[in-house]
């Protein structure tokens, strides 16, 4: 596949950014220790997996991306649209054990160096933000709820520079095979973007939705230039050999870890 995300042993990396001091990527599902399913590289401590497995996977990833896990930050995601400002004081949060810190946070941003923002995914959209000019990075977790409540707009509120200097990467997530019902479709039709561009009616109370397109449209609507938005072709629902899919695997699966950090 011709994509800016390049395969590595346990992750995909946005390779062209490495020379700019940005580490941006997402883990893949294979060659791990977890039974979600067998030999899975699960990165979530909040599912019924052995803590040892997660720690070993973290250590493996830290070595592969050359980013010490003591500098990672992980929030407790709740499918909302709250954004947290992260500093070096937060490094290590929820990495060894889960705590009450950063609870209810589905997006983070920082202007600090040597901080790796991380969150777990298994169909929802990882949205990465960066500006090398202004030394800014952010990461958002946008499922249908986060997309509908415009979590990307909430992140943009914390950007204190011209949006022409901001770049956004929309990472691997479910494809338009993901379906919603009439009630959810009606919610999306209240957004300030044309729902016809990302929702397709397939039958009674059945509508396919492309959450990647929806988030890209929202970002552009709020001032991020189209040419500054990159959307990967990778999809969790189409590439099960690489990714976990909560919906297709009926919840009995692991989670990938999306990450972004800057030197």
Curated annotation (Swiss-Prot):
<comment type="similarity">
    <text>Belongs to the purine nucleoside phosphorylase YfiH/LACC1 family.</text>
</comment>
<dbReference type="InterPro" id="IPR003730">
    <property type="entry name" value="Cu_polyphenol_OxRdtase"/>
</dbReference>
<dbReference type="GO" id="GO:0016491">
    <property type="term" value="F:oxidoreductase activity"/>
</dbReference>
<feature type="binding site">
    <location>
        <position position="141"/>
    </location>
    <ligand>
        <name>Zn(2+)</name>
    </ligand>
</feature>
<keyword id="KW-0479">Metal-binding</keyword>
<feature type="binding site">
    <location>
        <position position="79"/>
    </location>
    <ligand>
        <name>Zn(2+)</name>
    </ligand>
</feature>
<keyword id="KW-0808">Transferase</keyword>
<feature type="binding site">
    <location>
        <position position="124"/>
    </location>
    <ligand>
        <name>Zn(2+)</name>
    </ligand>
</feature>
<dbReference type="GO" id="GO:0005507">
    <property type="term" value="F:copper ion binding"/>
</dbReference>
<protein>
    <recommendedName>
        <fullName>Purine nucleoside phosphorylase SAR1163</fullName>
        <ecNumber>2.4.2.1</ecNumber>
        <ecNumber>3.5.4.4</ecNumber>
        <ecNumber>2.4.2.28</ecNumber>
    </recommendedName>
</protein>
<comment type="function">
    <text>Purine nucleoside enzyme that catalyzes the phosphorolysis of adenosine and inosine nucleosides, yielding D-ribose 1-phosphate and the respective free bases, adenine and hypoxanthine. Also catalyzes the phosphorolysis of S-methyl-5'-thioadenosine into adenine and S-methyl-5-thio-alpha-D-ribose 1-phosphate. Also has adenosine deaminase activity.</text>
</comment>
<dbReference type="Pfam" id="PF02578">
    <property type="entry name" value="Cu-oxidase_4"/>
</dbReference>
<keyword id="KW-0862">Zinc</keyword>
<keyword id="KW-0186">Copper</keyword>
<dbReference type="InterPro" id="IPR038371">
    <property type="entry name" value="Cu_polyphenol_OxRdtase_sf"/>
</dbReference>
<dbReference type="GO" id="GO:0017061">
    <property type="term" value="F:S-methyl-5-thioadenosine phosphorylase activity"/>
</dbReference>
<keyword id="KW-0378">Hydrolase</keyword>
<keyword id="KW-0560">Oxidoreductase</keyword>
<dbReference type="InterPro" id="IPR011324">
    <property type="entry name" value="Cytotoxic_necrot_fac-like_cat"/>
</dbReference>
<comment type="subunit">
    <text>Homodimer.</text>
</comment>
<dbReference type="GO" id="GO:0004000">
    <property type="term" value="F:adenosine deaminase activity"/>
</dbReference>
